Curated annotation (Swiss-Prot):
SUPFAM superfamilies: PYP-like sensor domain (PAS domain) (SSF55785). The lineage of its organism: Eukaryota, Metazoa, Chordata, Craniata, Vertebrata. Residues 121-188, 262-328 form the PAS domain. The gene is PER3. It comes from Homo sapiens. Residues 1123-1201 are annotated as: CRY binding domain. This is Period circadian protein homolog 3. Pfam families: bHLH_PER, PAS_3, Per3-like_PAS-A, Period_C.
Length: 1201
């Protein structure tokens, strides 16, 4: 195309079309979307950069608040994690408080306070201390509801700023966790807890805690924190302006600023003491709050850190030596060591004098923690311990770590010292190896608890681990010490096949093996699912340590050991011990061995007679074992207990009589064991002491004036004699005892079935034992014999009560088995306790009359093992002649023996005039039995009665041995009211507090009754009845029969010449030289002088030395008092008075003249009418003045002689 041509329209259209397309794309939606995306991406990038910058700034800010314990610079991740933990803690606490506000404690338990009341409370507390302010913040919002005005001055902040801020914002970041932990709403006490009783039990008071609170107004002072002591309380605040709003739970805090203890006001030097606790790895566990003003550290600053890092580098090595000594003296009291230098918060060092102790884990036997008690010796250079630290400690982490490892490995060693822990009474390091053999408490789990329960230690294994119980004496001591919780169960068991072998087991092992009542506490412990506490472990450890440390000296005689201990080496030794034990038992008792066929199996007799059960507790059966202290010997008589639980329970089953009598042969009476020579040699010193005291009692006669005064009180004599005589008897007969016993009350309602007597050759029917049931006595739990099983101890000697032969009277039948006493078949044999054989029926009458002042036929157990008041008589080791004569076929005594007995009876009747002249009953050794060891087969039952109880024979037969007559019979009653005898006016009744005894049918009935009410006595030819603690019984009478009743109910004796005698636990029959009776009844039957002359005509007139002079030498033995001639005695007294006359003060001549002017009778040398009285002062009636003066004169003459 040529140059000059104009463009064509085709080209211009194409260009315009291209421009239209571009403009269309620019205004299209897609274009706008792309443009928007580009712009948004650019803004997001800018936002990210901005957020990143802000985040970096926040992280840098959080790093400033990071806890100062970290020495290294915190990273961004650490700061974010710390911030996250803080956020979670705040959220958890706020949610917890909201939950409690809805479902927590009732709102009524917390008092409501208004803002005005809070201001009043704040002013009251802050006015006393200028460094204290009160702040109240809400649990829901965390903002301060109220703050006292002093807070602005103390914190150096404006009050408006404080009122609008959160309380947590004022705290240092490192103390927030402590603040939240101590302000949990569930733990806070109520502000008015002194008025809310329930609050004391629902919410325990919280200990004060320490926090640092920031002061200043700008950020430049944000690191200036001061320590404060905070005490939180719970209150509810309501707003009166907005009553529709509910009350708001709030925390009221009393905030007190802490100052350095070395600045004014300074803490006294003697009170700068604090305590710390650290682990074997030297890490602080607990720090006393007293350490805050002394060290400058808050408790949370030290807890969890090493104690070595605060010590001077040169003193760190001392901690190794200190912990070595801690290991050496583990469990002992605290010990002191070298002083150490401790760094305070400001960087200065203080010198501490420390004492150290430790606590030992009783399970692992390792030291759990160490307790240090520190006293500040020197103060730091900078007294402000809270000042900012300028100096830096030379921390060598490597050295500290090495020392910690060394000390930790040192304290890993177990402690073997058997002493208690020095950390109070929480635990002990005693001998717990086998008791807590489960390694350590950290390994305990559910499975481990089951194993511990299955492997529960028994008392046998504990004794085996202790390994200190070597002989029977120690075993007996342990039994006696623990008899309150474990009743000792001992007894004698004879095997049917073995025949006579005694097996010994301790009551501990026996009761733990069976299901007796004493194993209930052990079973409860085994069933307990909870692990024992420190207190329980310490208690058990104390018991074990006491058993280990207690050493009992060896006893004099070799005795067998417990079969559960390791003292016996083989079975042969055990058998030998058993055989020796049985031999020594029989030898020491001097009694014939009962044949094996007659011995009761399993501790009881064969039940053939029926009747009421006679129950004896298993604890009572153990009284036979132990060391006899009745005599003055150390003989050990141990009776083995039953082997199995069944045997132990058999002792408590009803016992009945063995109807087959046990025949005794003369070959069985062998003299082994304690003979006369052995006793005399062994008790020579005791004899001499007794004789000396006996002579002193006779010569001094301290009872003469007392008895003289008592004799004048006619109506009151019957009440006082029982008590006073018993005291005299107790002092005379028991003053040589080695142990004092507390008198226990006797069961007042103890009773038993009736016993009767009948013809000597009657039939045996309807056996009724004379022992009450256990339920009738309130003291069944104590080891006592039934009251009916023996005569009380205050009668000079004891015999058990036995059922009597059957008797048949008109209209009524009485039956009792004529066998041996049922109680003695199963009782354990002890020294002085002799089992009676089954005596033939014809001799039971004679056998029953043996008691009262004569030595006992069967003395019971030793008083040291019998707590009952009626078991205090002294045991005898020799067999009584009355027992041996019971087997005699001859009934008539030789004439020579009869005459000799008459002379002895006369002396013994006279000897009752003084409570100390009865040598037989007063001697604790009973030496008169040593002269009669061999039985005399020629003696008759009547002769045996005279041998054993001459006093009773004298009362029955009179002075010349003939039958009693109306002139010579009387009723001797001690401890019971007067007894009436209206049918005969001349019958005498010597009564002392005994109830009336009626004898309307015959005037010559005589009765010796001690503590027994009247007793009915129908007629029967020949019988003798012993009734002790029984219901009203009716016994036939005989002209020569004696009815012995002790503590029995009223009885009447309508027969002819029956007599009754009884003994009481409160008194004994002692007839003094000047006192014999008093007013007998309300009607006043007889005077005391007439009774004295009729009943004992030769006693009252003769002085005591004359009685002793007439005593046969055979009976008196070593108790002879030197003769005293009356003229010589009076002459010596006059000489003594003449020699004393010169030493007496005398009036001078002038004094005599002066007195003569005032008193005319001095000048005339006469006696005035006021003092010229012929009657006795103690007499009540003027009519009896002459007789009383004569009686008093006789008494004075007797005393002077």
């Amino acid at each position: 195309m040529p140059r000059g041509e104009a463009p064509g329209p085709g080209r211009r259209g194409a260009k315009d079309e291209a421009l239209g397309e571009e403009s269309g794309e620019r205004w299209s939606p897609e274009f706008h979307l792309q443009r928007k995306l580009a712009d948004s991406s650019h803004s997001e990038q800018q936002d990210r950069n901005r957020v990143s910058e802000e985040l970096i700034m926040v992280v840098q800010e959080m790093k400033k608040y990071f806890p100062s314990e970290r020495r290294n610079k915190p990273s961004t991740l650490d700061a974010l994690n710390y911030a996250l933990r803080c956020v979670h803690s705040v959220q958890a606490n706020s949610e917890f408080f909201q939950i409690l506000s809805q479902n927590g404690a009732p709102q009524a338990d917390v008092s409501m306070y208004s803002l005005e009341e809070l201001a009043t409370i704040a002013s009251e507390h802050t006015s006393k201390n200028t460094d204290t302010f009160v702040a109240v913040f809400s649990f829901l919002s965390g903002r301060l509801v109220h703050i006292s005005e002093q807070a602005a001055l103390i914190l150096n902040r404006k009050k408006d700023v404080l009122a609008s801020s959160h309380f947590v914002d004022l705290l240092a970041p490192q103390d927030m966790r402590v603040f939240y932990a101590h302000t949990a709403r569930a733990q806070l006490p109520f502000w008015n807890n002194w008025t809310q009783r329930a609050a004391r039990y629902e919410c325990a008071p919280v200990k004060p805690f320490f926090c640092r609170i920031r002061g200043g107004e700008d950020r430049k002072q944000e690191k200036c924190h001061s320590p404060f002591r905070i005490i939180p309380y719970l209150i509810h605040v309501h707003h009166p302006a907005q009553p529709e709003l509910e009350s708001e739970p709030c925390c009221l805090t009393v905030v007190e600023k802490i100052h350095s203890g070395y600045e004014a006001p300074r803490i006294p030097v003697n009170k700068r003491i604090f305590t710390t606790t650290h682990t074997p790895g030297c890490v602080f566990l607990e720090v006393d709050e007293k350490a805050v003003p002394l060290l400058g550290y808050l408790p949370q600053d030290l807890i969890g850190t090493s104690i070595l890092s605060y010590l001077h580098p040169e003193d760190r090595s001392l901690m190794v030596a200190i912990h070595q000594k801690v290991l050496k003296y583990a469990g002992h009291p605290p010990f002191e060591h070298s002083p150490i230098r401790f760094c305070t918060q400001n960087g200065d060092y203080i010198i501490l004098d420390s004492s150290w102790s430790s606590f030992v884990n009783p399970w692992s036997r390792k030291i759990s923690f160490i307790i240090g008690r520190h006293k500040v010796r020197t103060s730091p250079l900078n007294e402000d311990v809270f000042a900012t630290k300028i100096k830096k400690m030379n921390d060598n982490d490597k050295d500290i770590t090495e020392l910690q490892e060394q000390i930790y490995k040192l304290l890993l060693q177990p402690v073997h010292v058997s002493v208690s822990s020095g950390y109070g009474s929480l635990g002990s390091s005693g001998s717990q190896e086998q008791l807590v053999s489960i390694a350590s408490s950290s390994e305990a789990s559910g499975h481990r608890v089951e194993e511990t329960k299955a492997e529960q230690m028994t008392l046998q294994q504990v004794y085996a681990s202790v390994n200190k119980i070597k002989n029977l004496g120690q075993q007996l001591y342990i039994e006696s010490m623990t008899k309150s919780s474990f009743k000792p169960v001992t007894g004698t068991r004879t095997e049917p096949n073995g025949g006579g072998e005694c097996k010994t087991f301790t009551s501990f092992h026996q009761t733990l093996k069976n299901n007796s009542v004493y194993t209930e506490p052990c079973e409860d412990l085994r069933n307990d699912e909870h692990s024992p506490s420190y207190q329980q472990i310490n208690c058990i450890d104390s018991v074990i340590r006491y058993l280990k440390s207690y050493n009992i000296p060896a006893l004099k005689r070799k005795c067998i050991s417990c079969t559960n201990t390791t003292s016996s080496s083989s079975e042969e030794d055990k058998q030998n011990h058993k055989a020796d034990d049985v031999q020594a038992l029989q030898a020491g008792l001097q009694i014939p061995a009962i044949p094996k066929s007659e011995m009761p199996t399993n501790g009881r007799s064969i039940d053939t007679g029926g009747g009421a059960p006679q129950i004896l507790s298993t604890a009572m059966l153990s009284l036979g074992s132990g060391i006899s202290q009745c005599g003055y010997s150390s003989t050990i008589v141990h009776v083995p207990p039953p082997e199995t639980a069944r045997d132990a329970t058999l002792f408590c089953e009803p016992w009945t009589l063995n109807m087959q009598p046990a025949p005794l042969t003369s070959e069985e009476f062998k003299h082994v064991g304690l003979t006369a020579a052995v006793l005399s040699a062994h008790t020579q010193k005791e004899e001499q002491n007794y004789v000396d005291k006996f002579r002193e009692k006779i010569l001094s006669s301290p009872y003469s004036s007392y008895l003289q005064q008592e004799s004048r009180s006619k109506a009151k004599y019957s009440y006082f004699q029982g008590d006073s005589t018993s005291k005299q008897t107790r002092s005379a007969g028991c003053r040589k005892g080695k142990h004092k016993r507390k008198k226990l009350p006797e069961p007042p309602d103890s009773s038993s079935s009736n016993t009767g007597s009948g013809p000597r050759r009657g039939a045996h029917q309807n056996a009724q034992p004379c022992c009450p049931s256990a339920a009738s006595s309130p003291h069944t739990s104590s080891p006592t014999f039934p009251p009916a099983a023996m005569v009380p101890s205050q009668a000079p000697y004891l015999v058990p009560a036995f059922p009597l032969p059957a008797a048949t009277s008109p209209g009524r039948e009485y039956a009792a088995p004529g066998t041996a006493p049922e109680g003695l078949h199963g009782l354990p044999l002890s020294e002085g306790l002799q089992p009676y054989p089954a005596f033939p029926f014809p001799y039971l009458d004679t056998f029953m009359t043996v008691f009262l002042p004569d030595p006992p036929v069967c003395p019971l157990l030793s008083p040291s093992f019998l707590p009952c008041p009626f078991l205090g008589a002294t045991a005898s080791s020799a067999i009584s002649p009355s027992m041996s004569s019971a087997m005699s076929p001859t009934l008539d005594p030789p004439p020579s023996v009869t005459s000799q007995r008459r002379e002895e009876e006369k002396w013994e009747a006279q000897s009752e005039g003084h409570p100390f002249i009865t040598s037989r009953s007063s001697s604790p050794l009973q030496l008169n039995l040593l002269q009669e060891e061999m039985p005399r087969p020629s003696e008759s039952p009547d002769q045996m009665r005279r041998n054993t109880c001459p006093q009773t024979e004298y009362c029955v037969t009179g002075n010349n041995g003939s039958e009693s007559s109306p002139a010579t019979t009387g009723a001797l009653s001690t401890g019971s009211p007067p007894r009436e005898n209206p049918s005969h006016p001349t019958a005498s009744a010597l009564s002392t507090g005994s109830p009336p005894m009626k004898n309307p049918s015959h005037p010559t009935a005589s009765a010796l009754s001690t503590g027994s009410p009247p007793m009915k006595n129908p007629s029967h030819p020949t019988a003798s009845t012993l009734s002790m603690g029984l219901p009203p019984s009716r016994t036939p009478s005989h002209p020569t029969a004696t009815v012995l009743s002790t503590g029995s109910p009223p009885s009447e004796s309508p027969s002819r010449t029956g007599s009754a005698a009884s003994g009481s636990s409160d008194s004994s029959i002692y007839l003094t030289s000047s006192v014999y009776s008093s007013k007998i009844s309300q009607n006043g039957q007889q005077s005391q002088d007439v009774q004295k002359k009729e009943t004992f005509p030769n006693v009252a007139e003769e002085p005591i030395w004359r009685m002793i002079r007439q005593t046969p030498e055979r009976i008196l033995m070593t108790y002879q008092v030197p003769e005293r001639v009356k003229e010589v005695v009076l002459k010596e007294d006059l000489e003594k008075l003449e020699s004393m006359r010169q030493q007496q003060p005398q009036f001078s001549h002038g004094q005599k003249e002066e007195l003569a002017k005032v008193y005319n009778w001095i000048q005339s040398q006469t006696v005035t009418q006021e003092i010229d009285i012929q009657a006795c002062v103690t007499c009540e009636n003027e009519d009896s003045a002459d007789g009383a003066a004569t009686s008093c004169g006789q008494v004075l003459v007797e005393d002077s002689c």
